[in-house]
UniProtKB/Swiss-Prot annotation:
Keywords: Cell inner membrane, Cell membrane, Membrane, Transmembrane, Transmembrane helix, Transport
Keyword Isomerase included in the entry's annotation: no
Chief location category: membrane
Ranges facing Periplasmic side: 34-70, 122-128, 211-236
Protein name as it appears in the record: Inner membrane ABC transporter permease protein YdcV
Natural source organism: Escherichia coli (strain K12)
Pfam families per UniProt: BPD_transp_1
Gene that this polypeptide is encoded by: ydcV
Lineage, uppermost ranks: Bacteria, Pseudomonadati, Pseudomonadota, Gammaproteobacteria, Enterobacterales
GO cellular component terms, A-Z: ATP-binding cassette (ABC) transporter complex, substrate-binding subunit-containing; membrane; plasma membrane
Keyword Protein biosynthesis (UniProt): no
Length: 264
């Protein structure tokens, strides 16, 4: 009789892989509470919240956090608008070049970040646009659009066109149909796509390196701190903050898409 249960060694390998991937993250989280000033003294001498207080009083950290939040919020907003419009334009329409357009929409997230960053920097230099806040937002929006587009187009494909036709047959105009029929079906996909886009933007570093100029987002601040051993405890606190800000939206997006799939 065939058993559907996975072999023990396969389970062991899977859990070993999970531990291998997440152990460094747990180390950073643990040492954010370490009482020692040293980088990674083992075993930890105790627990303290001192470094959280120190980080909260550092103006350079607060400025980096504020900039990252602003960039992520604006890039997510742009991605929601452009990604939704692109998905709506490609939904239920067959025309020459449709597949090519879909490929171009997915290209920014498929290409290596260094290629995207270099291409954006070249484009900005060509039009004499100096790197700064605006260029960071544009750079982040290029790959955030992909996340929103994928979520929305997938939901569009699971939405029955007969619902739209029934709404129009009952006398609803285009706006009413969108407001009361289409948008409720897209709401969880939009929210999940927006949360994923925000998480991707908040911790993006490769594209940001090419487009930031003199600006310093939180990931760039962390990169600059690698050469300062005395600040390692504070750096661990900031790294923990980045992990929380990016992990929570990803978990929320997973939960939303799971609920949406179960409801279809």
């Amino acid at each position: 009789m065939h058993s559907e249960r996975a072999p023990f060694f396969l389970k062991l390998a899977a859990w070993g892989g999970v531990v291998f991937l997440h152990f460094p993250i747990l180390i950073i989280a643990a040492y954010a509470f370490n009482t020692e000033d040293a980088a990674f003294s083992f075993p930890p001498q105790g627990l303290t919240l001192r470094w959280f207080s120190v980080a909260a009083q550092r103006s350079d950290i607060l400025d980096a956090v504020t900039l990252s939040l602003k960039v992520a919020a604006l890039a997510t907003l742009i991605a929601l608008v452009l990604g939704t419009l692109a998905a709506a334009a490609l939904w239920r329409r067959d025309f020459f070049g449709k597949n090519a357009i879909s490929l171009l929409l997915l290209l920014p997230i498929a290409l290596p970040g260094i290629v995207t960053g270099l291409a954006l920097l070249t484009a900005f230099k060509t039009i004499n646009l100096e790197p700064g806040f605006f260029t960071i937002v544009v750079g982040h929006a290029t790959f955030c659009v992909v996340v929103v587009f994928n979520n929305v187009i997938a939901r569009f494909r699971r939405t029955s066109w007969s619902l739209v036709e029934a709404s129009m047959d009952l006398g609803a105009n285009g706006w009413q149909t969108f407001r009361y029929v289409v948008l409720p079906n897209l709401s969880s996909a939009l929210l999940a796509g927006g949360m994923l886009a925000f998480a991707l933007s908040f911790d993006e570093i490769i594209v940001t390196t090419f487009t930031a100029g003199h600006e310093r987002t939180l990931p760039l601040w962390l990169l600059n701190q690698l050469g300062r051993p005395r600040d390692v405890p504070v750096t661990n606190v900031v790294a923990l903050l980045v992990m929380l800000v990016t992990t929570l939206p990803i978990l929320g997006a997973w939960w939303l898409t799971r609920e949406g799939d179960n409801g279809q």
